[in-house]
Amino acid sequence: VEAASAAGGGDAGVYAHVNYHSSRAARLAAGACAEAVRGVVSGRHDRAYCLVRPPGHHAEPNRAMALCLFNNVAIGARVAQEQGLRRVMVLNWDVHHGNGVQKAFHEDPDVLYVSIHQDGLFPPGSGTITETGSGEGEGSTLNVPLPPGSGHEAYLTAFTDVVVPAARAFR
């Protein structure tokens, strides 16, 4: 990301084109998420919502992907752990599977990653129901792939019937 941006632009990863300003924008977005988490954990803020670009859930630990240069969500979750939170839950509520977040925490039993997304859309082959984590993190990944065309009701049902019980069990 840094090298491609410093060169004035180009490819920084799979479907991750950048220009001269991209690296700085991505660092500011990731930093905003990290600071928001620190603010909430310290009690300085009751809550935080980070409306940042570029997005992050496709960026993998060692590569940019699909317009995502750094994984803002994964960075925020790691900051929460560094600030002393024993358990962190990440919910991906999107048409796309957040493969980068899943990859970042696949072996971490202290981060529950739940993704509600359209089955088979992007990235191809990612976010299947059989992907549940590995090693010590086995069972810490929960994918809820919905059929194409699923509307609000399907997402809400998945949330109430799958996400809420998983969150309660993880506590």
Describe each model-derived feature in a short phrase.
Residues 1-171:
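HDAC/HDAC-like amidohydrolase catalytic core signature
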